[in-house]
């Protein structure tokens, strides 16, 4: 999909770049698969900010995605490819032969009219979902489960994919795009192919207001704050951060400091993303 530039009628239009999506459905989404969702503004139930830089944005309705793909041995036809405001990937509306409809993450190359199916022994074909134990080594997959029947958790964003590199006993070894090598139970399901809309990272919003439409608020440097607001704040004129190491507003080291503490799953990581 090519990028489109605009006539520079304003600074925002001059800098903007959009991905051309001619095959995306222009009408309304399937009403039965929509749910309402309210904005949190990054606040928890106490009203305190727990996630910064969140607030405002256009109203959105959540599209219910079938991450489990547990409707086995029943063929489905792709009715259309749609835009989803809640994720970077596009979604595909499926219609099963029994009349049921559902949304899935749209793989790269999937188009209207294609037939897909899920099950333990289905063909290795784009969009089909099956357990890792039945997928040939070297296959590129996406929407991978971390626990059997829990639903896809890995490789769901635009352009992402995972490669099945080995299978030994009850485990399958996956190579992630980050370079991490990870073991997953071979009973976990995955979908053949990689996620579509792979040029999403090439788009340019063009102006700050476009970011606000997405519900993202500005990020203020700690050095521009007062000492009461941030450890880097204060000082005369444009002073530096003043700390020997950069920290978060709560004093936790940042910019490279490792914060992952999950010994339970560490045993499944063969090689970390940092080598």
UniProtKB/Swiss-Prot annotation:
Keywords: Ribonucleoprotein, Ribosomal protein, RNA-binding, rRNA-binding
Region (Disordered): 227-261
Keyword RNA-binding attributed: yes
Gene Ontology terms describing biological process: cytoplasmic translation
Matching Pfam families: Ribosomal_L2, Ribosomal_L2_C
Transport recorded as keyword: no
GO cellular component labels: large ribosomal subunit
A GO term for molecular function: transferase activity
NCBIfam families per record: rplB_bact
Subunit record text: Part of the 50S ribosomal subunit. Forms a bridge to the 30S subunit in the 70S ribosome.
Family, similarity comment: Belongs to the universal ribosomal protein uL2 family.
Its biological purpose: One of the primary rRNA binding proteins. Required for association of the 30S and 50S subunits to form the 70S ribosome, for tRNA binding and peptide bond formation. It has been suggested to have peptidyltransferase activity; this is somewhat controversial. Makes several contacts with the 16S rRNA in the 70S ribosome.
Name of this chain's protein: Large ribosomal subunit protein uL2
Organism listed in the record: Xylella fastidiosa (strain Temecula1 / ATCC 700964)
High-level lineage: Bacteria, Pseudomonadati, Pseudomonadota, Gammaproteobacteria, Lysobacterales
């Amino acid at each position: 999909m090519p990028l489109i530039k605009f006539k520079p009628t304003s600074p925002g239009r001059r800098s903007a770049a959009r991905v051309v999506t001619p095959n995306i459905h222009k009408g309304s989404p399937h009403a039965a698969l929509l749910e309402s969702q309210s904005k949190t503004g990054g606040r928890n139930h106490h009203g305190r900010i727990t996630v910064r830089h969140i607030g405002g944005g256009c109203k959105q309705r959540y599209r219910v995605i079938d991450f489990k793909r547990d409707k086995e041995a029943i063929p489905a036809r792709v009715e259309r490819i749609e835009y989803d405001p809640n994720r970077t990937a596009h979604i595909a509306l499926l219609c099963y032969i029994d009349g049921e409809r559902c949304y899935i993450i749209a793989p790269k190359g999937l188009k209207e009219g294609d037939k897909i199916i899920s099950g333990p022994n289905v063909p290795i074909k784009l969009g089909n979902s099956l357990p890792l134990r039945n997928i040939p080594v070297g296959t590129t997959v996406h929407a991978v489960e971390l626990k059997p029947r829990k639903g896809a958790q890995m490789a769901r964003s635009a352009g992402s994919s995972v490669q099945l590199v080995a299978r030994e006993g009850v485990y399958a070894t996956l190579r992630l795009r980050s370079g991490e090598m990870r073991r997953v139970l071979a009973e976990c399901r995955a979908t053949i192919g990689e996620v579509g809309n792979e040029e999403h990272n090439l788009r340019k919003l063009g102006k700050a207001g476009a970011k606000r439409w997405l519900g993202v608020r500005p990020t203020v440097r700690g050095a521009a704050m007062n000492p009461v607001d941030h450890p880097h704040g204060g000082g005369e004129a444009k002073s530096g951060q003043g700390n020997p190491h950069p920290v978060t507003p709560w004093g936790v080291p940042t910019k490279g400091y490792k914060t992952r503490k999950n010994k339970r799953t560490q045993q499944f990581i063969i090689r970390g993303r940092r080598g």
